[in-house]
Amino acid sequence: IEPRQYWVVVGSNGSGKSAFALALQNELPLQEGVYRNTFKNVQSFSFEKQREILEATLKNLNNDDTDPDFFGQTARETILNGGSELTFCEQIAEKLGITYLLDRFFIKLSTGETRKVLLAQALLQKPDLLILDEPFEGLDQQSVQDWMAMLNELKKESLKKVLAWVMLWAVVAVG
């Protein structure tokens, strides 16, 4: 994978797409051969990451010390993830069309809105490789079309930078 490339990895469930993503992030031990990775900042987002964040939020909310009117972090706080790049956060939110979500509680967002917030969080880290693992899982057909349009716009813009993309996409066999 070279800078400014856009890859789509397609395969059935269990075919190794997520393992490939882990290998790209140096999170999977090499069994044999040689692996050379020139990417310095690899970011990924997936349905699993979304689920983990929501579970952690619910766990934090389900205790006696929590105010019942508190719903965790806002979308802005989730994007910033402890960082302080507020201006860049708002620029990314504008590019993704989610500025109206920034002050809403993350836990109250729809699946598609949550995904966009997590994409913004990944982009805030200024990755040189971005891995989107099953970005359309759980989205309706219109949301998938909206996402494809948004990703195509981001892809055009990223060609000016050194960002490379890998999208993992499951194919369901019919018949």
Where are these regions (language model features)?
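Conserved catalytic loops of ABC-family nucleotide-binding domains
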Residues: M150-M167
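Conserved ABC ATPase signature
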Residues: F105-L109
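Catalytic Walker B motif of ABC-type/P-loop ATPase nucleotide-binding domains
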Residues: L130-E134
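ABC ATPase nucleotide-binding domain signature region
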Residues: S18-G83
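Helix N-cap at the start of a conserved alpha-helix in ABC-type nucleotide-binding domains
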Residues: Q141-S143
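Conserved ABC ATPase "signature" region
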Residues: S84-L101
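Hydrophobic anchor residue at the start of the ABC signature
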Residues: L119
